[in-house]
Amino acid sequence: MAVIKGITPEQIAQICVGQYAGVDEVGRGPLIGNVVTAAVILDPNNPIEGLNDSKKLSEKKRELLFEQIQQKALSVSVGSATPAEIDELNILHATMLAMQRAVAGLNIKPSSVLVDGNRTPDFGVESHAIIKGDGLIDAISAASIIAKVVRDREMDALALLYPEYGFEKHKGYPTKAHFEALAQHGVLPEHRKSFRPVREALA
């Protein structure tokens, strides 16, 4: 595994060869729900305009690109780790597990895997961790969009089950509204019990 910071266009050209997969995660910081990862192999002959780090795109734009990625990519796979797995393994190791699941779910074995961030798990093929890769490499951008839309939809579904928590707004992140809901309504089965605010709410 190589960690690449400040990647140059020349380096991008060197590593973006063959049927490589981009991988990213969403949901390391929230107090509830799965950490969600995605792996995407794009089709160089069927480009998608407007790919970028999902955090820099509007919800409407993410949803539009989500559909285009599903239609145009060679392969798309989502992998998750549950709150129970997060509590057992810790969030870092659970995220690595979710990434392995996403790559294993691809219907094409990638020639290499490019991950946003500063570390990768063992995928059984060459891998590179690329800092800020979600804004630099289209396949990672696509993975960030898929993971973000999938996780947001999971939070919207949770909001229908527990409307008093406001998950459709804060998506489970540690906001003032979420802390107030925890204090008033208590901890849900889907909360991550190893995260301090949840642990304190249980005390």
Curated annotation (Swiss-Prot):
Keywords: Cytoplasm, Endonuclease, Hydrolase, Manganese, Metal-binding, Nuclease. A divalent metal cation binds at D24, E25, D116. InterPro entries: RNase_HII, RNase_HII/HIII, RNase_HII/HIII_dom, RNaseH-like_sf, RNaseH_sf. It comes from the Bacteria. Its cofactor is Mn(2+); Mg(2+). Gene3D superfamilies: Ribonuclease H-like superfamily/Ribonuclease H. Disulfide bonds: none annotated. It catalyses: Endonucleolytic cleavage to 5'-phosphomonoester. This is Ribonuclease HII. It comes from Shewanella pealeana (strain ATCC 700345 / ANG-SQ1). Its main location: cytoplasm. The gene is rnhB. GO terms for biological process: DNA replication, removal of RNA primer; mismatch repair. Endonuclease that specifically degrades the RNA of RNA-DNA hybrids.
